């Protein structure tokens, strides 16, 4: 079984999302001894944001692409291939300014491809082409967004839900770490998230 472990936080030491996702992956490896983990660290190897030339290449039939266009889509193709090759996905990320870090948004832009990860029907609807698989999303935020007055400010969770569903993935499991900006609340939030991992059916 193949696991794609996507890491987003640029904080390599002391990141709450990294700590909890690493714990989750360790738990998964205990349950699935043959688990093959592929780590995609977007903070260390950020994907370029899409430009006009690359988008044009996406919508050019593969057999009609120039060498330059083939080169332009190669990285995106690799991201899509990694997605298709995985049976499990663990995504760990902070919430920044109510939403996604731009490196994570870039990943979604690279893997959301007409004809590869979704298709249009004759009626104009869209159908995801990635077979449903289990996704664990470990999300850390400086303030509390899972309850209280700021719930509606959370733009991260709805985007992640819709973006994965867009390509056909609906089995999403969120593990939230609220209040990481304050050492006192962080010291409660991280163990709480780890306990929630222990309670999950994985």
Curated annotation (Swiss-Prot):
Keyword list (alphabetical) reads: Flavoprotein, FMN, NAD, Oxidoreductase
Q: Where does FMN bind?
A: 9, 15-17, 95-98
Q: InterPro entries annotated for this entry?
A: Flavodoxin_fold (IPR003680), Flavoprotein-like_sf (IPR029039), FMN-dep_NADH:Q_OxRdtase_AzoR1 (IPR050104), NADH:quinone_OxRdtase_FMN_depd (IPR023048)
What does the function comment of this entry state? Answer: Quinone reductase that provides resistance to thiol-specific stress caused by electrophilic quinones.
Subunit and interaction comment: Homodimer.
Q: Which HAMAP family match?
A: Azoreductase_type1
Q: Extract one GO molecular function annotation from the record.
A: FMN binding
Enumerate the cofactors the protein uses: FMN
Q: Does the keyword NAD apply?
A: yes
UniProt family annotation: Belongs to the azoreductase type 1 family.
Keyword Oxidoreductase included in the entry's annotation: yes
Entry's EC annotation: 1.6.5.-, 1.7.1.17
SUPFAM superfamilies of this UniProt entry? Flavoproteins
Catalytic activity, reaction form? 2 a quinone + NADH + H(+) = 2 a 1,4-benzosemiquinone + NAD(+); N,N-dimethyl-1,4-phenylenediamine + anthranilate + 2 NAD(+) = 2-(4-dimethylaminophenyl)diazenylbenzoate + 2 NADH + 2 H(+)
The free-text note explaining how the cofactor binds reads:
Binds 1 FMN per subunit.
Instruction: Report what the protein is called.
Output: FMN-dependent NADH:quinone oxidoreductase 2
């Amino acid at each position: 079984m193949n696991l794609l472990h996507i890491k987003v936080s640029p904080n390599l030491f002391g990141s709450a999302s990294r700590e909890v996702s690493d714990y989750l992956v360790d738990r998964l490896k205990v349950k699935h001894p043959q688990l093959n983990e592929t780590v995609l660290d977007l903070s260390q190897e950020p994907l370029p944001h899409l430009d006009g030339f690359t988008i044009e290449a996406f919508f050019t039939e593969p057999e009609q692409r120039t060498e330059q266009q083939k080169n332009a889509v190669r990285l995106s193709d690799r991201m899509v291939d990694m997605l298709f090759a995985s049976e499990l996905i663990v995504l760990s990320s902070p919430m920044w300014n109510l939403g996604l870090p731009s490196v994570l948004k870039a990943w979604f832009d690279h893997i959301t491809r007409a004809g590869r990860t979704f298709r249009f029907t004759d009626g104009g609807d869209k159908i995801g082409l990635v077979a449903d698989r289990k996704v664990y999303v470990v999300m850390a935020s400086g303030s509390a967004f899972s309850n209280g007055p700021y719930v509606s400010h959370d733009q991260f969770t709805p985007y992640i839900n819709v973006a994965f569903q867009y390509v056909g993935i609906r089995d999403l499991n969120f593990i939230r770490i609220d209040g990481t900006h304050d050492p006192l609340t962080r010291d409660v939030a991280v163990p709480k998230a780890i306990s929630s991992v222990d309670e999950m059916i994985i």
